[in-house]
Regions:
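Residue-level signature for tetratricopeptide repeat
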Residues: 7-8, 41, 71, 126, ...
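Structural motif corresponding to the intra-repeat A-B loop/turn of tetratricopeptide repeats
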Residues: 12-13, 45, 75, 130, ...
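TPR-repeat structural position
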Residues: 15-16, 48, 78, 100-103, ...
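TPR alpha-solenoid repeat register
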Residues: 1-3, 34, 64, 98, ...
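Short coil turns that delineate tetratricopeptide repeat
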Residues: 29-30, 59, 63, 93, ...
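"A position-specific structural signal for the A-helix of alpha-solenoid helical repeats
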Residues: 2-7, 37, 67, 122, ...
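Amphipathic alpha-helical segments of tetratricopeptide repeats
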Residues: 60, 89-90, 144-145, 173, ...
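Flexible helix-coil transition and linker loops at the boundaries of alpha-helical arrays
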Residues: 22-28, 95, 107-113, 170, ...
């Protein structure tokens, strides 16, 4: 237990290098958070020296430096406190994600001594992490201009409409990271601005060709703008990492092929309809999701379209068989599905109902 080891070392038991001995066994991904957690307890019981000793182990973690500055100020050591504030203010906010409400007092004090947009940003992240989104947005709005793209991405997440878009575009001006591109595409998709989504997707897919988060959104935008073959081609080159619930790639793949089949059906190109329908039934391995058991797949739309193509080709036997498959699909769910309408149409077209 790190707290027990710290007590032993702080009391003089060990090798004579207490800080080195303590740090030697703290090997987690975010060691500074361990020191922050321990220091918080010592501060809460009035053991300022112990808290400062632990915070010093956190290195150049800005929140730890602000905490040290605050505790030094409380102890009357204002010269060293100002030095800590200057160190903290000079550091980048990259990968700094504070969440402890106990850090708020130090940050609020720091703003009165050395105002800096980063302090408001850190405080906003803490407020946000503790479900006070309104206060978080208020703090972010008061920050003024910042030269840090994630600041604008964060603020955009708390906004809506044109105000949100303005922050996303500002983030893009500062840094065209994949996260900026992903946020922009998501904004356009959410607002049904499909052509903008296509333009943004094309730009960022070119810059980040192996990023399937962007690629899937771009593919969806291509599908929604009627560019079915480019969508299918893009999906064929994509490698989606398999993960639980990763159905998006296969869903767009199916949609693009079925929309293409419907387009060809309107032109009476029946052979291509059948080809597109058969392709839509595939479960490409590169799209990150495995094929379920056959009895778990609802192919009514595929079969219905293929029945229409067979009817156009004059193949009455195949038409009847496909319509029967649609009509006989076992409906086990209590709620109505759009596929149920196809079953009803198939029954009527088969002559089973008037």
């Amino acid at each position: 237990y790190h707290a027990a080891r710290f007590e032993q070392l702080y009391q003089g038991e060990g090798s004579g290098h207490p800080i080195d001995d303590l740090q030697s066994l703290i090997r987690n991904e975010l060691p500074f958070e361990t020191y922050m957690e321990l220091a918080e307890w010592y501060e809460s019981v009035g053991c300022t020296e112990e808290a400062l000793s632990l915070l010093s182990c956190a290195g150049n973690y800005p929140i730890a430096l602000y905490k040290q500055a605050y505790l030094l100020h409380q102890a009357g050591n204002d010269d060293e406190s100002r030095g800590m504030l200057q160190r903290a203010g000079a550091l980048s906010p990259a990968m700094v994600f504070p969440f402890r409400p106990s850090s708020l007092k130090a940050l609020e004090w720091a703003k009165t001594v050395q105002p800096d947009w980063k302090i408001d940003y850190y405080e906003a992240l803490i407020r946000w992490a503790n479900q006070d989104k309104a206060k978080a947005l208020e703090l972010l709005e008061n920050c003024g201009e910042a030269d840090y793209a994630p600041f604008y991405l964060s603020r955009a997440s708390l906004k809506e409409g044109e105000s949100r878009l303005a922050d996303l575009l500002k983030a893009e001006q500062i840094e065209m990271s994949w996260r900026t591109g992903f946020a922009l595409i998501n904004h356009y998709v959410a607002n049904n601005q499909w052509q903008k989504a296509v333009e943004t997707g094309k730009k960022y897919t070119k810059k980040y060709p192996s990023n399937y988060y962007i690629g899937l959104k771009y593919a969806k935008a291509l599908c929604e703008t009627g560019q079915y073959q480019p969508c299918i081609s893009l999906l064929s080159r994509m490698q989606v990492l398999p993960n639980e619930g990763s159905y998006a790639g296969r869903a767009v793949y199916r949609e693009a092929n079925l929309y293409r089949a419907m387009e060809q059906l309107s032109h009476k190109n029946y052979k291509q309809v059948v080809k597109s329908v058969e392709t839509s039934k595939e479960w490409p391995e590169n799209l990150g999701v495995g094929k379920p058991y056959d009895n778990m797949i609802d192919n009514r739309l595929e079969d219905y379209l293929e029945a229409k193509a067979a009817a156009g080709q004059g193949d009455s036997r195949k038409t009847s068989a496909l319509l029967a498959a649609v009509a006989d699909y076992t409906i086990s769910r209590s709620h109505f599905e759009s596929g149920n309408l196809l079953s009803a149409l198939a029954l009527r077209e088969s002559g089973h109902v008037p």
